[in-house]
Every structure is written in structure tokens, then in C-alpha cells.
């Protein structure tokens, strides 16, 4: 990605924000299982949310790589829960509104997302519908000037804090892909209920929740795009999500290398620093080599995205490759810590548990391989 002086100044500013506003409190947030709501306002005040939103909708009109950098830097600092939260707002929901929303919707929601006044979540997954989105059961039936919504969603990132829910629902239960639409649901509407915070093996500070919709009346004006085109919109916007996940993976790899390097330079075994042992050197060299390859792949796809040329297959290959590398490299680096790597007080343990879900959300890596194979084999 291009790095000019303005970009570097923006990145340095964000690094200072992480050091001053996040690092001293992150352990407590992980313990509490929730990032505080006021952090969103501080992110907004400092210009770190939805930075690529055009100025006419309250944003800064920055290039996309500014926004992606924020996700990478957050993950690299070891704050993966926050990276997922920011990514959900800036890399998932914001592009949907920018690219599909009506002028009224964009003018109403986007400025509040930029300031952090509104936190957003996208609700696709259900208990019986993960990779197979066509199997969702949540229904939104049109009645005069509103949709009546009934159903439930699970594994929803930012679910507890969400003020706006981008809901994927069946508007035609008899149809398959063409029966899916997307609604903008104000979380304050009657019938919207937020369930428990789900307990995960990683990403402890990232609020992940169940959402329930009981006869929720959503104005028809809050449908996003055309009725029945929801599945097509999802396919259209998924590349940005997968690119964001890949940026997070890259950041995690780079961050894990740094803390491991620092550890092996200090730690001694058998009378010498771990850094002098061949296995240690080879593990770190292998991690660095794979990080360089991952960086090149990410940069290529990010450049293609900015040129509106990134294909579904290309970003599927990237997401699969780099998250596999992330999990593999961090596992090998943790081994260099010995028993200390298994202790929560050592940051490498958090990098390890936070990495595992990267191969699952945003489309499982098995689905990514199927996408690549379909293009390769022609079916």
C-alpha cells in the first residue's frame, strides 16, 4: 500500500492513541468481556472510524488503505478484539451503506458512525445457517409501509453495543437466494432484544451476542437496496470484509514476531540466549519469510481493491492463505516461549487464541478453497 508523509503521520497518531487510550486498560476489558462504549466516542473524536466515508456524509474522504491500516495496526499491537470491533463498523457496515444505501440513509447513519455516536453490527449468521446463508430463517414480511421481522441471529460482533443492525432476512420465504433482503434495523425498536454475551476461547473483549426479533416493525424506507437482492449485495461486499480480515491477520503475524524476538533475545537456556539456538533462529526466520510473502499478497489485493478490480476468487485465496499462515506462525512462535507461552500473562497466548477464529468467520477457509477451485475447474 502507498505510504506518503500524510499516511505516516496518521498512522503515528493512531499508534499514540493505542498506547495512551487502549494499552493501559485492555487487560481489564478482556477480563470484563467488553470494550467500553465511550471508547467508540473517543475513536470518533480522533478521526479513527469510517475514515473513507466521503465528506458529504460527515467523513474524511480518505483512501481505503487508511481505513485498512487501522485494523492492521490494532491487531499488530495485540488488541484483536478492538480490531474486530472497528472492522465491523468501518470495513463491513460502512461500505454497505456507502455503496447500496439511499441518500437519506447515508445522510442519516454515516455521520453518526464516523463520530462513534452509532455503533453498528451486521447480522447474517443463525444457529442453523452459517456458511449456507440461503438457509436463514429470519423473516421480514412486507405489510403496507413496513416489514414485520421475526427470527434470531447468533455470533454477532458488536451485538451488545449495536445501535444499528444491518439485518439479513428472508422477504420471500419460498425463494432461495432471490428471497433475501437487507434491512437497517434501529436497535431501539420494540421487539429487538439482545441476548447474552457469548463466551469465546479468544477475542474476550469483543462483544459477541445473540439477537432476537419479535414482531419488529421496520419502516420499508429502511430496506437497504432492492428487495430480493440481498444475497447479491452480500457477495458484492464480502471482498472488503475478507480484505479486512487479511489485514488483521498480517498485523497479528507482525506483532507476534516482535514480541517473540524480544523474548528470545532476553531469555536464556543452557547458558546462552535462546536467540543463539539454531531452532529459534530458524523458527523466527521462517516466520519472517512468511510475513513478507503475506505482506506482498495483501498489498497486491489492497491495490486491486482500490482500483475496483479485486475479484471474489482473489480475495478468497488471500483470506485462506494468510489466516492459515497466521495460525501456523503464531503456534510455532508460542512454542519458543515454552510453558510461559501457555500463560495468559504473556501476550503471545492472546495472539494464539485470538487467531483461531480467523479461519472461520468471513467465510470458512473451506469455503474459500471451494471458491478458488470453482474458478480453477470451471464448475
Model regions and ranges:
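Alpha-helical interface subdomain recognition
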Residues: 1-80, 87, 100-105, 112-117, ...
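Short Gly/Pro-enriched turn/cap motifs at secondary-structure boundaries
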Residues: 86-87, 113, 128-131, 155-158, ...
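Helix-loop "lid/cap" segments that line or gate small-molecule binding pockets
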Residues: 91-100
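Flexible, small-/acidic-enriched active-site or ligand-binding loops
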Residues: 135, 190-219
Amino acid at each position: 500500500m502507498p505510504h506518503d508523509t500524510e499516511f505516516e503521520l496518521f498512522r503515528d497518531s493512531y499508534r499514540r492513541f493505542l498506547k495512551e487510550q487502549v494499552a493501559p486498560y485492555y487487560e481489564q476489558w478482556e477480563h470484563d468481556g467488553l470494550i467500553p462504549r465511550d471508547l467508540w466516542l473517543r475513536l470518533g473524536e480522533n478521526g479513527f472510524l469510517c475514515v473513507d466515508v466521503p465528506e458529504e456524509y460527515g467523513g474524511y474522504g480518505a483512501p481505503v488503505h487508511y481505513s485498512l491500516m487501522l485494523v492492521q495496526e490494532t491487531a499488530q499491537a495485540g488488541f484483536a478484539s478492538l480490531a474486530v470491533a472497528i472492522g465491523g463498523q468501518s470495513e463491513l457496515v460502512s461500505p454497505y451503506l456507502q455503496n447500496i444505501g439511499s441518500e437519506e440513509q447515508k445522510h442519516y447513519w454515516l455521520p453518526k458512525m464516523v463520530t462513534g455516536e452509532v455503533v453498528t453490527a451486521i447480522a447474517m449468521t443463525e444457529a442453523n445457517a452459517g456458511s449456507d446463508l440461503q438457509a436463514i430463517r429470519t423473516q421480514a414480511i412486507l405489510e403496507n409501509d413496513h416489514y414485520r421481522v421475526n427470527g434470531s441471529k447468533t455470533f454477532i460482533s458488536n451485538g451488545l453495543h449495536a445501535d444499528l443492525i444491518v439485518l439479513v432476512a428472508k422477504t420471500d420465504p419460498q425463494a432461495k437466494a432471490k428471497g433475501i433482503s437487507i434491512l437497517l434495523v434501529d436497535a431501539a425498536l420494540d421487539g429487538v432484544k439482545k441476548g447474552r454475551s457469548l463466551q469465546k476461547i479468544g477475542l474476550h473483549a469483543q462483544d459477541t451476542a445473540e439477537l432476537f426479533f419479535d414482531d419488529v416493525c421496520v419502516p420499508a424506507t429502511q430496506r437497504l437496496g432492492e428487495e430480493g437482492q440481498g444475497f447479491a449485495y452480500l457477495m458484492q461486499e464480502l471482498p472488503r470484509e475478507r480484505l479486512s480480515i487479511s489485514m488483521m491477520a498480517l498485523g497479528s503475524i507482525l506483532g507476534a514476531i516482535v514480541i517473540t524476538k524480544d523474548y528470545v533475545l532476553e531469555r536464556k537456556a543452557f547458558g546462552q540466549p535462546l536467540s543463539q539456538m539454531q531452532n529459534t533462529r530458524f523458527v523466527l526466520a521462517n516466520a519472517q519469510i512468511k510475513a513478507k510473502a503475506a505482506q506482498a499478497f495483501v498489498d497486491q489485493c489492497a491495490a486491486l481493491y482500490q482500483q475496483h478490480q479485486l475479484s471474489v476468487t482473489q480475495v478468497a485465496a488471500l483470506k485462506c492463505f494468510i489466516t492459515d499462515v497466521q495460525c501456523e506462525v503464531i503456534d510455532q512462535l508460542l512454542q519458543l516461549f515454552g510453558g510461559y507461552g501457555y500463560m495468559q500473562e504473556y501476550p503471545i497466548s492472546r495472539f494464539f487464541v485470538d487467531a483461531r477464529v480467523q479461519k472461520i468467520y468471513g467465510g470458512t477457509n473451506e469455503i474459500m478453497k471451494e471458491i478458488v477451485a470453482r474458478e480453477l475447474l470451471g464448475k
